[in-house]
Amino acid sequence: MKTRDIKTKKPWRKVRPDGYNSHGSSMLSQLTDTPFDSINCDIVTQSDFIRELYPSGHSVNDPTIYPDIFREEVLPVLDDKGNDTGRTTKRLYREPVPRYAFAFQRMILVKHLVHLCGNDVQFELNSNKATDEEIEMFTKFRTGWLDKDMEVAFYESARSCKSTADTAFVGFLKDGEFYWKTLSFLNGDTLYPHYDTVTGRLKLFARSFSDYSEQGDEMVQWLEVWDERNLYRYRQGKGDGRTVKEKLLGIFGLSGYTLVEQRPHGFPFLPVAYRRDEDGPCWTFSQDTIEGYEISFSQMAHNNQAYGEPIMVLMAEGENVDVMKDMNGTIKSVSMGPDDKIDYLQSQSASESYMKQLDTQYKMIFSQSFIVDPPELKSGDLPAAALKILYSPAYEKAMTDCKEYQTFLNDMVAIFSFGYGVEVGSTLGFANLNMKWWLEPYVHVNSSTVIADLASAVQNGFISRQTASERIETLYSTNSEWDRIMREAKQQQEADLLYQLRVAEVNEPTNPTADK
């Protein structure tokens, strides 16, 4: 496959309302063909997603979308000596309007990540009677999962997908050790997945990134390509970063990528886990409401700026008013006649309907994103059931996310299982290990409640002590906690038996004729 074919990617789209309910009509008894209805879309890029993530890039800060106000001022025309000539001129000037952008997108991103990644990935042996060898291999696997920071890898991947709509996890071997990295548009990586049209599996993957000079100019553009066997690195110089060969090829119109490295990646399969969200980032369905809220709030701020302060009103006859101001133009004193009056027009308050609009927009931002704005608690801790109901929208969204990320997690586990197996010499043991793994949504529940529920379940015989030890692992215990419990129990049994033997020796009656 040529490099120009590799660097192809399906764009993200926003559906337009063109053609909605405009397909003609027919009689109920008349059979008609279904009309062709094409959906018109606006193309959006991952750069747009980053603009949405950072408040400085929001549309409310764009004067072409939310324009400033242009005003006209009448000024007297003065002569060379500064005297009024009686003529006037007009000056057009731009008055900047207040602009307020809020980081709702970051709030949504953080809350989604907490409920998706708040609990570690759950692992469990999928066999009724696990042997000691399987338990030892399972403990080694889970220890390596934590040693290699695979929980961090999953978090970084989820953060990338929920903010820029795609992500990739890549494993690689170097000098017999397993390493990994996450690829994201946030870090300057553009990802190009290519799938098998029959199986739907990833058959080729590419990553494009650039090197820049101190002045911010692009010097070199790199293209890394993975297939089932090899890793390819292509180079294309830009500007001053071009080599002599690239400059000569450019003269003849042959500029392009040059293969600089090709080597086996060491995996028997494509060591890339890729995920793409076709809807876009996690705040996509709230984006229009966020933009409307920011413009509405900015308009209210502009109204407060114009009418928020009391307005002084002078009621006098003639020109008997003398106003003294300081250097900043603030009125310090007013001199008037005995019959003149001064008063203030009180500032206008925002109407109830306008505040209702802002409040509704604010609530819909949270509702459309399935996040919860925690209310103020009047008294102590809430029970676990009440907390789950309170955070039910976020919990429901996390449940669907866990299902959607399961395929990505499967690929991550496969890459880690082989790569870390090569490092510790347990490739075959990990491959034969019969276990299952899944994501568990996080909900804000007091840890003491979880411990009490597990203790009650063990006491009533609902679950075993070993299962309870595995469930409580992320709180207080370790990967091999059940082995420690069994070892302590055996040591206690040995100590009790030794004590009983010593007591028996002390209490055993002696036979005085035995020595003779």
PLM feature spans:
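Short linear motifs in intrinsically disordered
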Residues: 149, 155-162, 194-197, 224, ...
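Alpha-helix initiation and N-capping motif
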Residues: 47, 134, 138, 150-151, ...
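Short amphipathic alpha-helical segments
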Residues: 133, 137, 145-153, 285, ...
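Extended, helix-rich architectural segments
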Residues: 1-185, 511-516
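Extended, regular secondary-structure scaffolds
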Residues: 156-274
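Glycine- and charge-rich intrinsically disordered segments
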Residues: 1-10, 291-301, 305, 495-516
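Extended, charged amphipathic alpha-helical segments
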Residues: 252-389
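C-terminal helix-loop subdomains that flank or include functional centers
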Residues: 318, 322, 326-334, 353, ...
